[in-house]
Design a protein with these regions (language model features):
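Bimodal "functional hotspot" detector
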Residues: 1-289
Length: 289
């Protein structure tokens, strides 16, 4: 009798231990889901959306959002800009010549120096290439100026956005030049910056709105031609823009495309951190830099 009780006690203890071990060693469905989610998050931890400038079918540089590994953004951006890179959208192209190597680079107090191999000289459109490299790297907040060396020899020095992009020269008098960059869209809905050099003594924001209401070859603007900039003011790093009702569409909404066209253009011309959009003096939307 005692032997039977002892055996029964051992059996119950063993069974209990087996059940406990089973619970702790076999994950539940919920635990599997949590683990999988954590792995997915870990996989994209080093990626962030950045903008670079690639070439469209009309040979214009376009602003292109792309995921870039944050471990070495400068090197990765240069790789994306190189011809025959298969990681960019099929409708776009790079422009740094094939086989060009970034030999080294260094960043000192927001001044970036790039040292390329001699293949960089093989570019068929050096102005486009230099604008594209400059604008792409200046999208990084820790870079303000760029110099480009080829085999350790300085070639392009102190580059910034003042060099312009997709430049259009529309002036007749060199002595009264105004330079302003306008952002349009192309047929694939990529934003296309065009730096215009003109004889126009209006304030830059007025030129931006006037140009966005007019047509441009191979480019699109969604700003209604009846839109009027009633008034504007800059205050505490904010640019207030007050429009008439034609800023809005028939549904009383301001489309994202219209907002971005204006905002990108303003941020290239004004050192402000925010744009406040108003319609007939009523605040409707704001955009941060």
């Amino acid at each position: 009798m005692l032997r039977q009780k002892a055996l029964r006690k051992i059996f119950i203890t063993t069974l209990t231990m087996f059940i406990i071990l089973t619970i702790y060693t076999i994950p539940t469905t919920q635990n599997i889901k949590v683990l999988r989610t954590n792995l997915e998050i870990k996989d994209i931890t080093n990626l962030g959306t950045d903008n670079i400038y690639l070439v469209n079918n009309n040979n214009l540089l376009v602003k292109t959002p792309i995921f870039i590994d944050s471990k070495d953004k400068i090197k990765n951006i240069i790789n994306y800009l190189t011809i025959d890179n298969n990681k960019i959208p099929v409708s776009l192209n790079g422009y740094i010549p094939k086989n060009t190597k970034l030999l080294d680079y260094y960043l000192d107090e927001k001044y970036l120096t790039l040292n390329f191999s001699k293949e960089l000289n093989n570019s068929k459109n050096k102005d486009l290439m230099i604008s594209g490299i400059t604008y792409s790297l200046l999208e990084l907040s820790n870079i303000e100026k760029i110099s480009i060396l080829i085999d350790n020899k300085p070639v392009y020095i102190n580059l910034d956005k003042s060099i312009g992009i997709n430049n259009e020269y529309l002036y007749t008098n060199r002595n009264k030049l105004t330079k302003v960059t306008i952002y349009y869209l192309d047929n694939d809905n990529y934003y296309v910056p065009v730096t215009k050099y003109l004889n126009n003594d209006k304030e830059k924001i007025e030129i931006i709105i006037d140009e966005l209401k007019s047509t441009n070859k191979n480019l699109i603007s969604y700003l209604n031609e009846k839109t009027k900039l009633i008034d504007y003011k800059e205050e505490s790093n904010v640019l207030f823009l007050n429009f008439n009702e034609y800023l809005e569409d028939p549904n009383k909404e301001v489309t994202e495309k219209v907002l971005n066209e204006i905002a990108y253009s303003v941020f290239d011309s004004y050192n402000v951190n925010m744009i406040m959009f108003e319609v007939n003096s009523k605040k409707i939307k704001y955009i941060n830099r």
